Amino acid sequence: MIERELGNWKDFIEVMLRK
């Protein structure tokens, strides 16, 4: 996995959790 991918995933999860 690439660090950039992990960063994107973290943002995606945060948005989903906020929803």
Curated annotation (Swiss-Prot):
<keyword id="KW-0963">Cytoplasm</keyword>
<dbReference type="GO" id="GO:0005737">
    <property type="term" value="C:cytoplasm"/>
</dbReference>
<protein>
    <recommendedName>
        <fullName>Uncharacterized protein YpfM</fullName>
    </recommendedName>
</protein>
<keyword id="KW-0346">Stress response</keyword>
<dbReference type="InterPro" id="IPR049852">
    <property type="entry name" value="YpfM-like"/>
</dbReference>
